[in-house]
Amino acid sequence: ILCVERNRNVLIMAIDKARELGLDNIMFLCGTAEYLPSYIPNSSIEEIYLNFSCPFPKKSHEAHRLTNPRFLEIYKPMLKNGGAICQKTDNMHFFEYSIESFSKCGFKLSNISLDLHKSGFEGNIETEYEQKFSSQGFPIYRLEARL
């Protein structure tokens, strides 16, 4: 597992959590998605998880969204044949934007949920962030995108 995080403080918390849980199959990279091609060979990733990435709600910050077509084109070569990008977010507008971006970039969408915790979807690994917002009654949006 490769965890990519641009915020050093968040990355340190993730490293500490992995140590606390005794996880030894995780590598950590402090940086942004633009750096991934330097570290990841083509056709080597089965799944990319975009869990609660920043929605950058201002239109002027759209280029920073991890589901912006610019980033989707970075991820494409890394995915194995049949590989998927799985996204979870609590932000409806970001989710709608993501659906549009994935579609424009040739991805096929599946397992779309507008309220993950009420959907009966099995196999969800709940993040701390997800637990927090779900417990406050916010729906969690989820999708899988494949080429």
For the regions a protein language model found, what residue spans apply to each?
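Short alpha-helix immediately C-terminal to the canonical SAM-binding loop
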Residues: V10-M13, F95
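S-adenosyl-L-methionine
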Residues: A14-E47
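Conserved class I S-adenosyl-L-methionine
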Residues: P57-E62, C86-C105
